[in-house]
């Protein structure tokens, strides 16, 4: 598709779609709880719809009516063997978390996904699940999907140190631990998003968190709840950057989730000198209104414990860095290589084709700014965040056209992205 270029300003106020991580987990917890769960403001992107369909296939009644998702929970032991293989679509979150959920189910399943998911290694979650007594295997020594899994009612608790920072692996092991008899201990390498911990408590579960050490005593029962999903800061990130780098711009983003494990991009914007205001903070919902304005930016260094707090935002942060004076270094981010694409290489190739100066490294990028961007043809390779990054980059292009191939990938997380972009261009 041909993207909008050379815009004069961005103005307006929007509510970004519901948080993808919380949306996935609300369906999972609602299904495993006893009683009814109602979920408001859920993200209806393709990844979350995949999770919803998987739990329907596992025998859970889920109704989507009048903007509210109603889940009739079946309890920890109530899932039923599916008639067919479970389709996870493009969703790494779905296949990893649901592997943990099915660890205690005494039936065999096959889980598969699209071409992109089939290239993503699952050994980081299959290895610890095997230690708990689960029979699970995939293709090659990295356990690429499709996966075959047979759970067990005699799930063993686990004491496990995560070799990488991964909220998905941590969450999969927590779901498994809820079904094991005894105490499981999970130790994180770095702090990662803690939505699973928060929602476990919300649904009446128990755990203790001591620094990076999480202890779960199993088995447990959960109780259905009302869940209100805040806006996704990973989706808001595209507008935060757009408002900072587009000329004569001011954007107001309402009801954005600001869980402290997800706000690394706010730290980066401030380090780069961006104009960012946080107002209307709701400490219970962990949400706020974010306001950004066009800014003069400077390069910075991004690495270490900051990386898990902004791993999904690094593509759009790379674009931000191309519009900052000086050098920005992104390091300790080798995890980018096993996302929907190798995001280190694909981001560098896409932005360099538009005139940026980015050098890929083994664990990140070196970005020299400030760059004038020009027209190009960019392929998302099925990666939603590459698509949205390119659409924001195109706004700055004064010379030439920007063509985006496989733009439909954006529907994975933000189906209304181009509608919101139009409203801000004309605001």
Swiss-Prot record:
Main location: cytoplasm
EC numbers: 2.5.1.19
Key words, A-Z: Amino-acid biosynthesis, Aromatic amino acid biosynthesis, Cytoplasm, Transferase
Activity regulation statement: Competitively inhibited by glyphosate. Activated by ammonium, rubidium or potassium ions.
Metabolic or biological pathway, per its Swiss-Prot or TrEMBL entry: Metabolic intermediate biosynthesis; chorismate biosynthesis; chorismate from D-erythrose 4-phosphate and phosphoenolpyruvate: step 6/7
Binding residue positions for 3-phosphoshikimate: 21, 25, 166-168, 312, 339
Binding-site residues for phosphoenolpyruvate, renumbered to this chain: 20, 92, 120, 168, 343, 385
InterPro entries linked to this entry: Enolpyruvate_Tfrase_dom (IPR001986), Enolpyruvate_Tfrase_sf (IPR036968), EPSP_synthase (IPR006264), EPSP_synthase_CS (IPR023193), RNA3'P_cycl/enolpyr_Trfase_a/b (IPR013792)
Localisation: Cytoplasm
Database matches in PROSITE patterns: EPSP_SYNTHASE_1, EPSP_SYNTHASE_2
Catalytic activity: 3-phosphoshikimate + phosphoenolpyruvate = 5-O-(1-carboxyvinyl)-3-phosphoshikimate + phosphate
GO cellular component: cytoplasm
Gene3D superfamilies hit by this protein: Enolpyruvate transferase domain
Gene Ontology biological process: amino acid biosynthetic process; aromatic amino acid family biosynthetic process; chorismate biosynthetic process
GO MF term list: 3-phosphoshikimate 1-carboxyvinyltransferase activity
Pfam families linked to this entry: EPSP_synthase (PF00275)
Catalytic residues of the enzyme: 312 (proton acceptor)
Known partners and oligomeric status: Homotetramer.
Function, as annotated: Catalyzes the transfer of the enolpyruvyl moiety of phosphoenolpyruvate (PEP) to the 5-hydroxyl of shikimate-3-phosphate (S3P) to produce enolpyruvyl shikimate-3-phosphate and inorganic phosphate.
Similarity comment text for this entry: Belongs to the EPSP synthase family.
NCBIfam families: aroA
Protein name: 3-phosphoshikimate 1-carboxyvinyltransferase
